[in-house]
C-alpha cells in the first residue's frame, strides 16, 4: 500500500510539473470559428500542441473577442497578445511595403498567391513586417478573391458601382481603388460591418465567398459580383519581441506549425469556397460577373498603381514582384 501511494504521488508530481511547464499562447481573429480563419487557426493549434508534445498550448479567440484587427495588431506589437490572424491590408498602416500584395490585380490566381507567400518572396514580406511593423509572420491564410457584395443593385459594369458606399479596411490603397472606379468607399472596422450593412450606413463590402457566407452577409446583401481585383491574404502574426523571447526550439515549432497549417488552409479554401458560393445562391443572393473587367484593370493600372509605387517600395520593386509571379 505504501509503495502504491508513493507511485501515485510520483505520477501526480510529474503531471503537475508538466502542467506547470506548459506555456499557453492566445490567438485572436475577427471571423467565426467555422470560417477559413477558424480552419487555419484550429490546424495551427493542433500542430503546435502536437509538435511540442503538449508543452505549448494554444487558445483561440474567434469572432473579434479580443477587439478589432487593428487593435489586435497593436497588441501583438507590444506583447500583450501572442498571435493575431488579420487581413494583410490591416498591416499596411504599420508596414506600407506590404501594400504590394494588395495592389489591385497584382495577384491574379491561386498559384500567384502561393508563390507570393512562399520561398524568397515570403522571406521578403517577413523581413519587412519585422522591420517596419514589429511583427513576425508565422503563416498565411489563402482566402481567395475579395468579391463585391451590395444591397442596392447588380454590378456588372463600371457604371453600376458609381456612388455605392463600399466598406473598406483602414487601407489607403483600397480607398483609392474604389474611388478611381467611382464608388464612395468608407473605412470601417471589421466588427462594425454587419451592423453597418444592416442599418444602411454602407451599401456593400468585399470579401471572399467563405467569409461572406460565414458572416451571414446574405442576410443583408442581395447582390454579389466576382471582381478579381484583390486576392485576400491573411497572415498570422506574432510580435517580434514575443517571438525573440522564445527558445530556438519553440520558434522552430511555431514556424513549422505555421507552414503546415498554411498548406492545409489552401486545400480547405479550394474545397470550401465553391460550397459557400452555392449556399449563398440558395439564400437568394444574385451572383454576377463583370462584362468589362478589362476597363476596371486599366483604371487600376493607370490611376492607382502610379499613386502608390513610392509607398510600397517603388515601381522597380513592385515590377520585380510581378516578374517573379510571371506577369
Predicted regions and their residues:
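Sec/Tat signal peptide C-region and signal peptidase I cleavage site
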Residues: 16-22
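N-terminal secretory/targeting leader peptides
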Residues: 11-12, 23-112, 121-327
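Hydrophobic helical h-region of N-terminal Sec-dependent signal peptides
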Residues: 7-16
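Bacterial N-terminal signal peptides that target proteins for export
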Residues: 1-7
